[in-house]
Amino acid sequence: MRIGILGGTFDPIHYGHIRPAIEVKHALALDKILLMPNHIPPHKQQPNLTTAQRLKMVADVCSQLDGFELCDIEAKRDTPSYTVVTLEQLKSLHPEHELFFIMGMDSFLQLKSWYEWQRLFDFAHLVVCQRPGWQLDAAHPMQQILTARSHAHQETHEGHAKNTHKNSGQIFPVTITPQDISSTQIREQLAKGEIPVDLLMPVTLDYIQNQQLYLP
């Protein structure tokens, strides 16, 4: 089974998370996507909502999307959510599956600052989402890694990637539709009493309004 993994604070989860994940799922013919809320994100300040509230929002979204599941493996931890630890744990639980960890190009460019980043490739492939026409500068330090591990996939009529012989360790660049949406933007709108109907799934907006979340 080919499993995509998208982690994040999801404070709140919005179309800027969901639409790229759907595009990646189709582009790489993934069997499912795990949406994985962080508990204590190492690179971010503490979230505005509780872990339970963010889990509820993500679970609601997954119930509306075919092939999407909530993964609470990081939310159950009392320690920071280091990706390499999570992937190692997921791989030990599902050694027969191919894991595809999804990230944006901005995160990929900062990869060397991640905890034990080299070991990520022992457990999963990386999927690097990029904007149409975007190219990494040839002199950038990450270009060598991208080139060495990049898997130029050729899609069949079913959209399945050919020639994937390795169970982990490759990089799959995927061009996605740009989404100019941020959780900060949504929280600010909600605090002003605005209703961002175009940025959130209806099930998420209903939960936020019913629970009166993100109010000043």
From Swiss-Prot:
What does the record give as its pathway? Cofactor biosynthesis; NAD(+) biosynthesis; deamido-NAD(+) from nicotinate D-ribonucleotide: step 1/1
Which InterPro entries does the protein's record reference? Cyt_trans-like, NadD/NMNAT, Rossmann-like_a/b/a_fold
The record's CDD domains line, in alphabetical order, gives:
NMNAT (cd02165)
E.C. designation(s): 2.7.7.18
The reaction(s) annotated as catalysed by this protein in its Swiss-Prot or TrEMBL entry are: nicotinate beta-D-ribonucleotide + ATP + H(+) = deamido-NAD(+) + diphosphate
Matches recorded under Gene3D superfamilies: HUPs
What GO annotations for molecular function exist for this entry? ATP binding; nicotinate-nucleotide adenylyltransferase activity
According to its UniProt entry, the protein's GO biological process terms are: NAD biosynthetic process
Task: Tell whether Transferase is among the UniProt keywords.
Answer: yes
Keywords of the record, alphabetical order, are:
ATP-binding, NAD, Nucleotide-binding, Nucleotidyltransferase, Pyridine nucleotide biosynthesis, Transferase
Q: Does the keyword Transferase apply?
A: yes
Q: Which family does it belong to?
A: Belongs to the NadD family.
Function according to Swiss-Prot or TrEMBL: Catalyzes the reversible adenylation of nicotinate mononucleotide (NaMN) to nicotinic acid adenine dinucleotide (NaAD).
* UniProt name for this protein: Probable nicotinate-nucleotide adenylyltransferase
Q: Which organism is it from?
A: Shewanella baltica (strain OS195)
This protein's encoding gene: nadD
